[in-house]
From Swiss-Prot:
Residues 401-413, 425-445, 546-568, 637-648 have a biased composition (Polar residues). It comes from the Eukaryota. It comes from Mus musculus (Mouse). Residues 1036-1065 form a coiled coil. Residues 1096-1146 form the AWS domain. Residues 121-151, 181-247, 344-367, 401-466, 540-695 are annotated as: Disordered. Residues 187-201 have a biased composition (Basic residues). This is Histone-lysine N-methyltransferase NSD3. Keywords: Acetylation, Chromatin regulator, Chromosome, Coiled coil, Isopeptide bond, Metal-binding, Methyltransferase, Nucleus, Phosphoprotein, Repeat, S-adenosyl-L-methionine, Transcription, Transcription regulation, Transferase, Ubl conjugation, Zinc, Zinc-finger. Residues 670-691 have a biased composition (Low complexity). Its EC number is 2.1.1.370, 2.1.1.371. It is found in: Nucleus; Chromosome.
Amino acid sequence: MDFSFSFMQGIMGNTIQQPPQLIDSANIRQEDAFDNHSDIVEDGGPTPFEATLQQGFQYPPTTEDLPPLTNGYPPSISLYETQTKYPPYNQYPNGSANGFGAVRNFSPTDYYHSEIPNTRPHEILEKPSPPQPPPPPSVPQTVIPKKTGSPEIKLKITKTIQNGRELFESSLCGDLLNEVQASEHTKSKHESRKEKRKKSNRHESSRSEERRSHKIPKLEPEGQNRPNERVDTAPEKPREEPVLKEAIPVQPILSSVPTTETSTGVKFQVGDLVWSKVGTYPWWPCMVSSDPQLEVHSKINTRGAREYHVQFFSNQPERAWVHEKRVREYKGHEQYEELLAEAAKQASNHSEKQKIRKPRPQRERAQWDIGIAHAEKALKMTREERVEQYTFIYIDKQPEEASSQAKKNVTSKTEVKKPRRPRSVLNSQPEQTNAGEVASSQSSTDLRRQSQRRHTSLEEEEPPPVKIAWKTAAARKSLPASITMHKGSLDLQKCNMSPVVKIEQVFALQNATGDGKFIDQFVYSTKGIGNKTEISVRGQDRLIISSPSQRSEKPAQSASSPEATSGSAGPVEKKQQRRSIRTRSESEKSAEVVPKKKIKKEQVETAPQASLKTGLQKGASEISDSCKPLKKRSRASTDVETASCTYRDTSDSDSRGLSDGQVGFGKQVDSPSATADADASDAQSVDSSLSRRGVGTSKKDTVCQVCEKAGDCLVACEGECCRHFHVECLGLTAVPEGHFTCEECETGQHPCFSCKVSGKDVKRCSVSVCGKFYHEACVRKFPTAIFESKGFRCPQHCCSSCSMEKDIHKASKGRMMRCLRCPVAYHVGDACVAAGSVSVSSHILICSNHSKRSSQSAAINVGFCFVCARGLIVQDHSDPMFSSYAYKSHYLLSESNRAELMKLPMIPSSSASKKRCEKGGRLLCCESCPASFHPECLSIDMPEGCWNCNDCKAGKKLHYKQIVWVKLGNYRQVLWWPAEICSPRSVPLNIQGLKHDLGDFPVFFFGSHDYYWVHQGRVFPYVEGDKHFAEGQTSINKTFKKALEEAAKRFQELKAQRESKEALEMERTSRKPPPYKHIKANKVIGKVQVQVADLSEIPRCNCKPGDENPCGLESQCLNRMSQYECHPQVCPAGDRCQNQCFTKRLYPDAEVIKTERRGWGLRTKRSIKKGEFVNEYVGELIDEEECRLRIKRAHENSVTNFYMLTVTKDRIIDAGPKGNYSRFMNHSCNPNCETQKWTVNGDVRVGLFALCDIPAGMELTFNYNLDCLGNGRTVCHCGADNCSGFLGVRPKSACTSAVDEKTKNAKLKKRRKVKAEAKPIHEDYCFQCGDGGELVMCDKKDCPKAYHLLCLNLTQPPHGKWECPWHRCDECGSVAVSFCEFCPHSFCKAHGKGALVPSALEGRLCCSSHDPASPVSPEYWSKIRCKWESQDSGEEVKE
């Protein structure tokens, strides 16, 4: 801040107002300051300030008889200048990009060149003096001395104001300084009212004389509301054009607007391609264009330097005035490196060069690439073609009109204190009274007020409304007339360079007469330098007037006036500023400004009118604002039915703040959509792109299969593939009429979604909306594929993460995010989605499997075996270079450190050594993750070529909120550092902007609390108990110790959260039975066939229709006794037949209950008689092959509940996936129901019938008669007296129970115990290696052998009855007849000749693997122990 300004501000205490234009620099020099915004007024001519006078403005007397200045100021300088509006279109730093100051010492003739009709008077700082009589009225040309004759020092301080706040440095380089004057509201309303009254009386005569000498012209609104416009530019003639010409002096009129030149010294013309440099942003491709307000493309700024108006090539439309020194001719994108080299040469120090050479951030680089693509395309065009193709079109919108002028003219003088809102009243009909009539019919006070707002009179034609850059010129003819504000008001926020649209809440705007018509819209297209704006009215010209009460009660519903929108008035002041004696009162407020907005062509040009809805942008529209040539700013999503565009909010509010009026008017800044955008993260992350879409996401969630971009304007194939395409991606120019079918559906050659090989032998997924095709062999490779009777459900309908937990029901339920390129799907949310995946839409992503890794980003494997030891690395940090970075998890974040380390050799120093593990040897390294293994630990040979571990083969991925070990760099001296994988939306914005690719995810380092992007090759999971991999280290860095403690604590927190979540999930699922599909009849699966008998083959019973209960339980029905159900067309009883329970499904009411120890059960609600039909056991009818396949799959997925019931050899009912209530009936050794096979219409079906009378409320059970296919037995919890203890074991009969009772009683007598001879059951050592431990025992009778699973090369115990390899020939696998008694080698009769020889150990046979003289070592027998078991431990001999 300049000291001269702060000094004057503190001494004078006056409010400093905004300048008439944006000023180049904040370093404003106030030496020799004078009023540099006034106009020279000729005798008898109109004063320029008469164009727009504010409320409370006091007319000064004329200058005919006033003495000249005595304080050294030039006599031509006036204390009052015209009211200047803040330009609605933001320019670069303070109106220019040259970074120079705006106010310097120069002559008035160099500074003033044109007149600004609508300007705003600046305050006049008065030097405090002793109380004296008030001075005489001042004049526009001079500073009036006081009555005492002593001159009064009047200083004019020019101050840069932007976004309603004072600006004292470049908006591209720093935040705005918010310095509000402390003395703004020092005077009370009463004092202000009294002063205004005195001034009014004192200068009444002066004002009357001035009105007689200066006639009030009726100016054309187009001329009035255009700042920076030269007076000599011929405007459209107003009604009183002769008066205006007489009033305008002939000599040049001074103005504060920079001189606009279009001929002399102009290097670039409209349509030329240039590079421009703004602030810290890189050289950006631009096109020279015409300013929509000045209608010129080149001007001389206040320092005499030339500036060019350029529009930037990017995804968002931006424009600015740029200094000529920062503009270069564009010759191609290769020129960028030359510009960097040139800037580097001019750099003063090394740090500046580093900044210049620093890589651009991710978002900025993406936007820059978009701009380069446009520029390269435009480079091939001629200048005229570029102007036609890329020039912005500005859609102008009429704001809400103020109340009628007549109503304002009759207001009393006391209303001077009323808060004033500058506004313009539009009317389709001209005013009936001219200026003279107004002057003669109204009081002087009313005339003064009207002269302030005469540019808003009803006599005026429509002034230029807000210009919004809607499309480029190439699409002006196709601009739809329906793109209008529908019952809404448009509020455009001002930013440092380019306004951004903010669509306010939709309000119904009504005029004073209540016609209820809405705002019409105008379209402006800038045709070139000096050309007038072409206006094409969309719709009818309607007058929209809102009463003052409506605006005062609902300020948020009021549209900004043309005075604020068409001119260059600044944004609303953040705080009300109380003016000096000659300014408005403290109760007056500034009008809300609606700056302009530009929307570039690419956002809407390809979108048809039918799809003009708020949606997701294609391409780089998802990229943050920080990559554009702008600073970050608040943005709110649009609700208007306009072109598809979404904006991302990077902060809750603008860093420069909003004025009170803006916040009150546009509360959509903090709307839900904007809040959702604020939480969004990087475009290349899953959750980030989900959050950015917000309310603009299409429910259909369509993605083009060619370009992989989401959008609403897609063509859907109506064939079997269910895919969507962009019209451009299909090579079409228009949307095809009628039904569209893609080429694959037309030819029938669909590619397999797994192997991508086309052919007709592929099968479609059974899900109707899926549309994916697979080879059957390909889809069977995925454990998440579900095969059904009618086909299969592909893996994209099952969560890959949940399937790893062997919970197939959980994995197949819920909303999925499906990969666009491969058969992978995850549940929506961070819990299941693999870290590093990229979201395309809310339900479509590209998984991390498609990460393209280079040789430089290969996996960094650990130096230990994951099986036998969770490795230990010992290192002494003798190398000072490495020791300084060994415990720094983030050293690669430093560019200098990275460059320093990369100069060193990749071979680790000799100080790093691997601790000898127990087994030693070579390590087998995974190509996808850091895992390493000893081949011996995996029982495999060292493979050739690439190899992936089992987890990577199975598709196991890392997830967010997972604790991991991370290593940055390829050096062993750099430790593996504990970190947590973070969701991209939870990391800071600068971390989101770091360079990363598909498959990368951010991690948070414990201890140092840094972030970085890594991939799976540098990360492996943290396991409870992990400490560090440098236990041999004598000293551990404090940061690393802290990291270990934080990681352990965080791991326990996440573990507790996970366990709590699982407990809640288990509790929730325990309230209802596991999911299944309820069916009423059996469903045939596979090759099973259902037999249907002919009516002639159905037996006929001998029951009569007149019987009491024909075919009932107590009847002598032959069909019932033979378990054959009667047919209604064959049975003599007809409809009264009671032997049709299967067909009619006559089940007693029952309910599913939760039992104490047996899971879910079935309980009857009413009493059931003995023999009564209870239920039919229904499910899927499968054959034996399918049954064994399902059992095998169930074992692999750790499923222990089975619902299979065998009807015949090739007919098995599986009620697991589908069934009825009978599937919940539990087993009991003493059941109350039994299963019976009945023939129903020729087909065999299974029914459950009551074995006894069952009272209401009792659980229904039956005996499973389980056939044990495995060697394990399931414990029975039925609680019956005759319970066998295990399922599949026959329950004890009555005779057996009696014998057991007798034996139990006999034990009470004294007996003499006799030791029974024991016999060996199974050996307690492995027959292969001789060690003990967990052993698998052979099920062959009298075989005592047992084995380790690893010795058998098995990972799980074998299922069913298992025989050890000792009983099979080693050569052919047939039954062995000769055995080696020291190892599992055995031979059949054909291969046993000469294979075995007697040994020296008791003549036992041994194979060639043993020495016959000493087949085993002496220590071998010391390890062998046998398990002995008595034949009858309870047998005792009676004394």
